[in-house]
Amino acid sequence: MPLLLSGRKFRHDLEASGCLAINVPLEGGAETRLLRRLKAAGYKTQITSVRGLGDPEAFLLKLHGIRPPHLGHQNVGRNGALGEVQQVIPQVNELLAGEKSVVLWLLEGQVLSRSEILSLCDLCDKEPRLKIVIEMGGARALRWQSMRSFIQ
């Protein structure tokens, strides 16, 4: 990887495909460098892990309920047999409120199933201002490709 990575080709490929699979060097640094370049180009960015994502569309764009762990406590007769449901604010919906495009950088993407990856790609098609970068593992050098070509 060159010392000064301009990020122009990465940004062009991200705008063209909407969803990218990326392999980054294990020593780190490449992802934050690219995120800085994207912020300088006018994108809003958010970095998060895919572990515990569940349904990607509901988690990222819709108000949804979760059931917190009970930790052995009993709440008999108050909330039913399944426990209480807490409403969680969507992760990306507030970022899409403005005019700027949003880049969602997802770590540990190798744990995602093929259907979850396809649903993330479909999210980019539904919302053209949302761009998603998924880290699919480590490599000796920084490389990326379209997510649809990666899963085939």
Swiss-Prot record:
One of its GO terms (molecular function) is quinone binding. Its EC number is 7.1.1.-. It is an enzyme of class 7 (translocase). One of its GO terms (cellular component) is plasma membrane-derived thylakoid membrane. It catalyses: a plastoquinone + NADH + (n+1) H(+)(in) = a plastoquinol + NAD(+) + n H(+)(out); a plastoquinone + NADPH + (n+1) H(+)(in) = a plastoquinol + NADP(+) + n H(+)(out). It is a peripheral membrane protein. Keywords: Membrane, NAD, NADP, Plastoquinone, Quinone, Thylakoid, Translocase, Transport. It is found in: Cellular thylakoid membrane. Belongs to the complex I NdhN subunit family. NDH-1 shuttles electrons from an unknown electron donor, via FMN and iron-sulfur (Fe-S) centers, to quinones in the respiratory and/or the photosynthetic chain. The immediate electron acceptor for the enzyme in this species is believed to be plastoquinone. Couples the redox reaction to proton translocation, and thus conserves the redox energy in a proton gradient. Cyanobacterial NDH-1 also plays a role in inorganic carbon-concentration. NDH-1 can be composed of about 15 different subunits; different subcomplexes with different compositions have been identified which probably have different functions. This is NAD(P)H-quinone oxidoreductase subunit N. The lineage of its organism: Bacteria, Bacillati, Cyanobacteriota, Cyanophyceae, Synechococcales.
